A protein has these predicted regions:
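Signature for HUH/AEP ssDNA processing cores
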Residues: 1-114, 118-131
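A common structural junction motif
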Residues: 88-92, 134-144
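Epigenetic mark-reader domains in eukaryotic nuclear proteins
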Residues: 14, 169-170
Length: 170
């Protein structure tokens, strides 16, 4: 299985929702690259001045989506990476358990939670980038529907582990 190349930008911090500066460009060529980078708060787009905002969006070659399993309290309804693979057969993507993977959150039972990274051809229009996320949500409505804008960041995960799933991307 060939892993895909994509670019993310990291901050110098972890779990800082107020941060908007992502100065470190990281080219992801394998799971080890992503595991190291995902230890820090990060974005999957380039922004003018390295400052995250919708208006500063410049380019992205990765579509990040969250699989939080917030759609149901019934464990039998929770979705797994196998469900993602079945919905997008042959599509390669990276998966990193989120910082709240298998932990109680907001009084709700522990459940599988993942950050998924789909490498894409470069996109330079924020509206098109959002439409791509909306398309993915239409195909798999279990992704977090609040994470569609072009300025979405992902919290870093201490001890992040990454997997390449689903297939080959040439």
């Amino acid at each position: 299985m060939n892993e895909a190349i994509m670019t993310i930008y990291t901050a110098d911090c972890r779990e800082n929702a107020m941060n908007t500066l992502y100065p470190r460009k990281v080219t992801i060529t394998c799971t080890d690259d992503l595991a190291k980078a995902a230890a820090y708060d990060h974005v999957c787009a380039e922004y003018a001045g390295n400052r995250r905002s919708n208006s500063a969006f410049r380019c992205a070659d990765c579509l990040p989506l969250d699989l939080d399993n917030s759609h149901s309290e019934n464990p039998a309804d929770w979705k797994t990476l196998d469900d993602v693979n079945a919905t997008f057969p042959g599509v390669g993507y990276y998966a990193v358990p989120s910082r709240n993977h298998m932990k109680e959150k907001d009084g709700k039972a522990a459940r599988p939670r993942y950050h998924l990274y789909f490498p894409i051809d470069p996109v330079t229009d924020a509206a098109e980038y959002r439409r791509m996320k909306e398309y993915m949500l239409a195909m798999f409505p279990y992704f977090d529907d609040k994470a569609k804008d072009a300025a979405r960041f992902l919290f870093g995960v201490k001890g992040a582990q990454a997997e390449f799933m689903g297939g080959d991307i040439e």
